[in-house]
């Protein structure tokens, strides 16, 4: 088989997996996660710059736990600790040490999502929001469109709502992204596209509470891409992760920044967009990128990206760390397109 045919065959397989591949089960309850360092570009190991982002490190994460994988969202806590959720209703806690090891790992099911009367549609968790003051989490689900609230450390479910505005969304194309702004408002972005635009909603407060008002608006991603996750930055900007599957290049990802002014300008049915600051495509390290989080070290900001392996042997759970520039530039260049797989 020629190299070109091999690349095309792999790309077709990856495209199928992106929509939900065949799960590979390893019966184990291990709580150990290992990390193997990866280069950004094996063809050019010295490369560090990707658009406006500076590459710091990348790892392939592995665990023998049967519920590890399928990561769909990522939140950063203090001390390089992270919380991830999978689209199988699992919550994953871990810490990245200074020397690139994983410790303090736990892999456990979300409360209230397992049992004889619960189907996969109930467990299809996609988005994750966090309130650092109360320690509460909010998880969005796209199989049966819902938002669930959890107490500190996911000890118990404390609320459930199925917003009427989301019930007409296509199956498995619901609330892909949820994040909480510093002032307590929430934004939810649906995975589905209509004329290349995402449906989205601004919630005036906790989405679980009946008194919270909703402002529908639309978000336009980069052409050919879909939003998979987003995270507020300390300065009020929003970092957005966008993903695409293309032939023959396979998975690609773009990181964009939404300005505070754009958020302030959200009105009923308004259309907003963000500026692309970096693009990942082959030969750069990239997979089915689904989660994004932010950490800081003094004045330095770091973006962390994580991929969804769809519980298959053909994909990997990749964690990547990039540094944001100290000051936003007036012009944010996009990384040049790289050759395909």
Give each language-model segment a name.
Residues 2-341:
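Sequence/structural signature of beta-propeller domains
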């Amino acid at each position: 088989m020629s190299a070109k045919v091999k690349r095309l065959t792999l790309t077709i397989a990856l495209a199928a997996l992106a929509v939900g591949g065949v799960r590979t089960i390893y019966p184990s309850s291990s709580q150990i996660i290992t990390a193997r360092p990866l280069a950004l570009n094996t063809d050019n190991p010295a490369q560090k710059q990707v658009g406006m982002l500076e590459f710091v490190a990348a790892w392939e994460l592995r665990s023998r736990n049967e519920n590890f994988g399928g990561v769909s969202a990522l939140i950063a806590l203090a001390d390089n600790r992270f919380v991830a959720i999978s689209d199988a209703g699992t919550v994953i806690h871990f810490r990245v040490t200074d020397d690139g090891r994983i410790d303090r790992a736990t892999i456990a099911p979300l409360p209230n999502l397992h049992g004889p009367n619960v189907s996969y549609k109930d467990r299809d968790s996609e988005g994750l929001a966090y309130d650092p003051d109360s320690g509460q989490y909010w998880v969005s689900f796209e199989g049966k469109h819902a938002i669930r609230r959890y107490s500190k450390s996911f000890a118990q479910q404390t609320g459930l709502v199925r917003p009427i505005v989301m019930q007409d969304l296509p199956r498995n194309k619901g609330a892909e992204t949820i994040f909480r702004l510093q002032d307590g408002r929430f934004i939810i972005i649906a995975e589905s596209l209509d004329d290349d635009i995402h449906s989205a909603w601004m919630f005036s407060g906790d989405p679980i509470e009946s008194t919270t008002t909703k402002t529908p608006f639309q978000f336009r991603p980069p052409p050919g891409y879909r939003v998979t996750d987003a995270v507020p930055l300390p300065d009020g900007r929003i970092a957005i992760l966008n993903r695409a599957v293309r032939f023959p290049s396979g998975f690609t990802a773009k990181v964009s920044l939404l300005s505070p002014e754009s958020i302030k300008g959200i009105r009923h049915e308004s259309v907003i967009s963000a500026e692309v600051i970096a693009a990942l495509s082959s030969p750069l390290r990239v997979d089915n990128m689904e989660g994004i989080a932010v950490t800081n070290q003094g004045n330095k900001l770091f973006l962390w990206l994580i991929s969804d392996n769809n519980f298959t042997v053909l994909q990997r759970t990749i964690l990547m760390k990039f540094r944001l520039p100290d000051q936003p530039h007036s012009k944010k260049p996009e990384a040049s397109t790289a050759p395909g797989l």
